[in-house]
């Protein structure tokens, strides 16, 4: 009785919500304790039972603050190291970001308790998953979006991974919310029926992991080399270090020419404008073509627009075997989804003068097109994404083509030091390979550089914070997964059906 009385106190529930939210961080890399996702979501649902809408919204907010406060604390590393502001201000900015993201979980909990106040199957198994899908969409879309820490990613090595090639990671989010709600209902009501249904729903997708949605093409196996330069972020954009940086990458690449069909340098490996490096690029292109290798590299490009101003792009270009390199070549990729404050500054004229954090090097990029043709290097077709873009499953899928041989992502996670951020980023990249059934080549400045197999498995990787080259044979695949064909449309149809049913049944219950 004492415990039952204690748990009814709103302050206790708020504290528990904070703890259950923080527990959710353990579901993601580098911890990879996937059951923590279920425990965390169970806590969110159970704590909002028998609460008024505003109380539930507060619980949802605290739960989100626990999740994001612990799960994205790596943002502090970047702000504290490169922001040039006092410590308390750095902490405040991280708290502000976590609080903003928590508004969406608060919205979920508040609306759920407002429209479906009773602790029923309808609430936990039908309404909650549909509403969660909507609020998670909003979190990934409003103000350019920040869809980090979606619990579906926790299943990259878990029992539900087989659902990803069929309906994508968001379908796993949907199912996790449903299963967690049923488990919470079984626990609170002490009823075995929701428990049985939850176990069945959780077990049903397990055999799907054994379906192979792709066909390997061993005759097209190539040797790939990815150069991890490990250039400190504090030196990366120092003009005095440019020549040394080029030497590091060239010296690591020269022995690979003629041996590796494809050589990859990371995001902005060449820390200068492409137009300024024409002699270097053309000489390197000629050497690569003479030896039958191709190079893909990140670089910065600036182009004069119709308003007679320069648009600066975070770009990938190709050199080597095939058509000679040209500054006018269309075989390039310009990053579309830019990171606020890192690659562009909202309200630029107001914020830039305020602090160094708002005036970081290379923080005035322009957007490339949303849909871009694949890169072609040495006859290899690559669907590309730069850094943050790889977490955007629908965008990667929209750029994916049936003839894509590999997914390619280049990144620079040096901003986030030895935090958990790069591991979370890596986990999300693995999900893209699983969803689209293609090997993924991930080249980074200081880790995590790796080759991911078409089932999301790690085939090869090198340690973080080392200056090394990852060289391995990679076999391309062919074939289209159901998710590659349809994207998130089936899930949105399911969400609409669940939402309609939940509203209709709720109205009927109120009329009785």
Curated annotation (Swiss-Prot):
UniProt source species: Escherichia coli (strain K12)
Functional pathway: Protein modification; lipoprotein biosynthesis (N-acyl transfer)
Name used for this protein in its record: Apolipoprotein N-acyltransferase
Family: Belongs to the CN hydrolase family. Apolipoprotein N-acyltransferase subfamily.
Result after altering residue 343 to A: Loss of activity
GO annotation (BP), single: lipoprotein biosynthetic process
Location of this chain's protein in the cell: Cell inner membrane
Oligomer and partners: Monomer.
Result, substituting residue 339 to A: Loss of activity
Effect on the protein upon substituting residue 388 to A/W: Loss of activity
Pfam families for this protein: CN_hydrolase (PF00795), LNT_N (PF20154)
InterPro entries: Apolipo_AcylTrfase, C-N_Hydrolase, C-N_Hydrolase_sf, LNT_N
UniProt topological domain (Cytoplasmic) ranges: 1-9, 49-52, 117-120, 190-191, 509-512
Resulting phenotype, residue 339 to G: Loss of activity
Disruption phenotype: Essential. Depletion induces juxtapositioning of inner and outer membranes and alters the architecture of the cell envelope. It causes mislocalization of outer membrane lipoproteins. The mutant has a copper-sensitive, temperature sensitive phenotype.
């Amino acid at each position: 009785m004492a415990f039952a009385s204690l748990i009814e106190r709103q302050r206790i529930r708020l504290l528990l919500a904070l703890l259950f939210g923080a527990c959710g961080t353990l579901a993601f890399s580098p911890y990879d304790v996937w059951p923590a996702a279920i425990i965390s979501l169970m806590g969110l649902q159970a704590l909002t039972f028998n609460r008024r809408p505003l109380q539930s919204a507060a619980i949802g907010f605290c739960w989100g603050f626990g999740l994001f406060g612990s799960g994205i604390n790596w943002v502090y590393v970047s702000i504290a190291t490169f922001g040039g502001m006092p410590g308390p201000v750095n902490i405040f900015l991280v708290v502000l970001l976590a609080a903003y993201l928590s508004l969406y979980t608060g919205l979920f909990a508040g609306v759920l308790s407002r429209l479906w106040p009773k602790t029923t199957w309808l609430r936990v198994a039908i309404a909650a998953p549909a509403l969660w899908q909507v609020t998670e969409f909003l979190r990934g879309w409003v103000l350019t979006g920040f869809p980090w820490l979606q619990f579906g990613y926790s299943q990259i090595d878990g029992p539900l991974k087989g659902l990803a090639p069929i309906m994508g990671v968001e379908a796993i989010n949907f199912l996790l919310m449903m299963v967690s709600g049923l488990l919470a209902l079984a626990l609170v009501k002490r009823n075995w029926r929701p428990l049985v249904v939850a176990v069945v729903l959780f077990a049903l997708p397990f055999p799907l992991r054994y379906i192979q949605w792709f066909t390997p093409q061993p005759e097209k196996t190539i040797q790939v080399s990815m150069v991890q330069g490990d250039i400190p972020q504090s030196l990366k954009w120092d003009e005095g270090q440019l020549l040394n940086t080029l030497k590091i990458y060239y010296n690591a690449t020269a022995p690979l020419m003629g041996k590796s069909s494809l050589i990859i340098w990371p995001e902005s490996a060449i820390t200068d404008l492409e137009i300024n490096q024409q002699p270097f690029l053309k000489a390197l292109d000629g050497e690569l073509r003479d030896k039958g290798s191709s190079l893909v590299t990140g670089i910065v490009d600036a182009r004069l627009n119709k308003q007679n101003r320069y648009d600066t792009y975070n770009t990938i270009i190709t050199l080597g075997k095939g058509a000679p390199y040209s500054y006018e070549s269309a075989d390039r990729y310009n990053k579309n989804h830019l990171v606020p404050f890192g690659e562009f500054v909202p309200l630029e004229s107001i914020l830039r003068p305020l602090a160094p954090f708002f005036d970081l090097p290379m923080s005035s990029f322009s957007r490339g097109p949303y849909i871009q043709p694949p890169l072609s290097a040495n006859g290899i077709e690559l669907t590309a994404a730069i850094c943050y873009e790889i977490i955007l499953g629908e965008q990667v899928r929209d750029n994916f083509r049936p003839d894509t041989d590999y997914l390619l992502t280049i990144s620079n996670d040096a901003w986030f030091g030895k935090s958990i951020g790069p591991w979370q980023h890596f986990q999300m990249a693995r999900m893209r390979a699983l969803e689209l059934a293609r090997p993924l080549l991930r080249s980074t400045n200081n880790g995590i550089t790796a080759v991911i197999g078409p089932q999301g498995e790690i085939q090869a990787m090198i340690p973080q914070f080392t200056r090394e080259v990852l060289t391995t044979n990679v076999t391309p695949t062919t074939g289209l997964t159901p998710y590659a064909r349809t994207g998130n449309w089936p899930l949105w149809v399911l969400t609409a059906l669940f939402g309609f049913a939940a509203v209709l049944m709720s109205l009927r219950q109120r009329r009785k």
